[in-house]
Amino acid sequence: MRHIPLNLPGARRGLLGAARILPAVPLIALAGLLLAACGEEIAVEKTVTAEDLIVEGPHPHAVLEIRDLGEIRIELLPEIAPQTVENFIKLAEEGFYAGILFHRVIPGFMIQAGDPLSRDPDPRRVGGGGPGYEIPDEFSDFPHTRGVVSMANKGNRNSGGSQFFIIHGDSPGLDGQFSVFGRVVEGIEVVDAITQVEIDIYGRYGPTDRPYPVPVVIDAVRIERANENIAGN
């Protein structure tokens, strides 16, 4: 089983080797039996979608306030990753994410944040930090499509903590291997803007794919629980 480490070495090298990316395979479920015109019963197959994996909301939302770029609103999905969502809300409400950077930006793939070491003036330390504890994996069949939010890990089972990534371009090679816990419902254009910033692709001043010279800062993450100021509800 392949994992995205907290600090990915290189763009997609050693992570999603092109020859190893699997095509998206839809899940097929038996929807039920229908009576045909001739009176015979025929089985009808229904493709299971991402929407079938979650219950109807409202869900809690996390709003990432990105300095100079705007807000990213994430719908959290506790029914597919309850412990991951609970941990993310806890860290956000404690102010853990305030001042943390998006330290990895790979256009067409993902943007990654959540490392407290990204506040350190020495960028060589960036990529391996966390909250000081680890949480269990909560893998599901929810696909890693554009805007999906998933938990990063250290390359081992049950090694996530605080680092997360937002999918920029559909990445089926990650499906079932990382804990999806949310999806962007507003501000995907901010995600797009982050992928357009200048990055240190050669690692001259720290890890590769780190925004440089202008960092992408999360000023705050605010949690809006169900029925509390969530747009559209």
Tell me what each language-model feature is.
Residues 2-3, 34-233:
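Cyclophilin-like peptidyl-prolyl cis-trans isomerases
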Residues 20-34:
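Bacterial N-terminal signal peptides
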